[in-house]
């Protein structure tokens, strides 16, 4: 992997993380607005509900990022295996061609 590819993947990953972080903040603002209307902002239950909601949102984000990275790793592994298989098939075909050429060129 070239350096440029690694940098682009890193920047792309950070950008996706920022988008996910913005989505979580937006959900938190909507959720906090709802809780402030129904619960007092300084009550114990408000703090507990807010903490649980934050943990669930970050858990979903972590699982999603883990799933994306595993899919990317599987895709890279499959591409590497496909390339190795095609290279070995080409070398086998070359060996067959050599043997047929050698058998045809033998003196009779």
From Swiss-Prot:
Keywords: Glycoprotein, Host cytoplasm, Late protein, Membrane, Signal, Transmembrane, Transmembrane helix, Viral envelope protein, Virion. It is a single-pass membrane protein. The lineage of its organism: Viruses, Varidnaviria, Bamfordvirae, Nucleocytoviricota, Pokkesviricetes. This is Virion membrane protein OPG135. Residues 1-22 form the signal peptide. Its main location: virion. Envelope protein. Required for an early step in virion morphogenesis. The gene is OPG135. Residues 76-108 are annotated as: Disordered. It comes from Vaccinia virus (strain Western Reserve). Induction: Expressed in the late phase of the viral replicative cycle. InterPro entries: Poxvirus_A9 (IPR006920). The chain crosses the membrane at residues 46-66. Residues 23-45 are intravirion. Belongs to the oerthopoxvirus OPG135 family. Glycans are attached at residues 84, 89, 97. Disulfide bonds: none annotated. GO terms for cellular component: host cell cytoplasm; membrane; viral envelope; virion membrane. Residues 77-92 have a biased composition (Low complexity). It is found in: Virion membrane; Host cytoplasm. Residues 99-108 have a biased composition (Polar residues).
């Amino acid at each position: 992997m070239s350096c440029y590819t690694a940098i682009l993947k890193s920047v792309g990953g950070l950008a996706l993380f920022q988008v996910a972080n913005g989505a979580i903040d937006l959900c938190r603002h909507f959720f906090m607005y709802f809780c402030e209307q129904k619960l007092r902002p300084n009550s114990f239950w408000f703090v507990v509900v807010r903490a649980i909601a934050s943990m669930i949102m970050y858990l979903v984000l972590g699982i999603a990022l883990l799933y994306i990275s595993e899919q990317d790793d599987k895709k890279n592994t499959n591409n590497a295996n496909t390339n190795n298989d095609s290279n070995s098939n080409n070398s086998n075909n070359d060996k067959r061609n050599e043997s047929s050429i050698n058998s045809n060129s033998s003196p009779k």
